[in-house]
Amino acid sequence: MGFYEGDDNDANTKAFNDKYIKDQKFATAPFWNLFPKLRDIDEYDNPLLPLPFNFNFRDLGDSALAMASGIPTVKQFDKCEELKGQSAWTTQGIWKCLVPSKAIPPLPQLDFLLPLEEIKSDKSHSHGLFFNDFNLFLKWRSHMNRLQKQRIKTRSTAVEPLARTPEDLMLNWDDLHLGNDAEYASADGSKKIVGRAQSISTTKDSNDAKPSTVKTEKIYFDDGTVDITTTTTSKGSSPQVKHKVVSVDEDN
């Protein structure tokens, strides 16, 4: 079913969580935490927000208040009760009302209303993961936070042993961000990048007054291979580029 039941080892839930981290770059807090908790308002109230300009939160749409606070307005909840719906939350902590089929058709065109049976029968979570208890949502967020930290640590560890000194090797941590796997892959898509490293050094031949700069770029793949490109430049000469692919064990 489309509901989270507290079992993170469930095959469908694990598959959803893994894809969610990769595709959406899971954050440690939902974006609506940036907003203050809003009191219940009716259509004539103006929410008081600490903004330096006149702002009406209702202008953002029918579910804006639910997005900001994780709870529905009284008006939204009354509509949900009228339709015999049940409360649920999305992975972003946004409140939704899941309405049984007996209220359909017609289902009012309100963006906080969703068909209950369609969500319950969604075993593969193609419509997303839903929580019928806010405590379960918080439990899932906590699990995902730990999972992301574990993934980052695992990938960082795979690169760290290859470093010589901070001066010799500069890790490009932007490319290690969790969730970028789909972007960083080999041309044929057969393997994924798990890390990058770069080093720049300057050498000077005793017989030549012209110094040379050697830039080495390494790309680490999930199959244990390393793509190495070395570019040597010196003043007055064309850059010399060498490229090779070796195993991690052969990389030195």
From Swiss-Prot:
UniProt KW keywords: Membrane, Mitochondrion
Subcellular location: Mitochondrion membrane
Membrane topology per record: Peripheral membrane protein
Principal place of residence: mitochondrion
Entry GO CC: mitochondrial intermembrane space; mitochondrial membrane; mitochondrion
One Pfam family here: MPM1
Region Disordered, residue ranges: 230-252
Miscellaneous: Present with 3390 molecules/cell in log phase SD medium.
Record's protein name: Mitochondrial peculiar membrane protein 1
Species: Saccharomyces cerevisiae (strain ATCC 204508 / S288c)
Gene (name only): MPM1
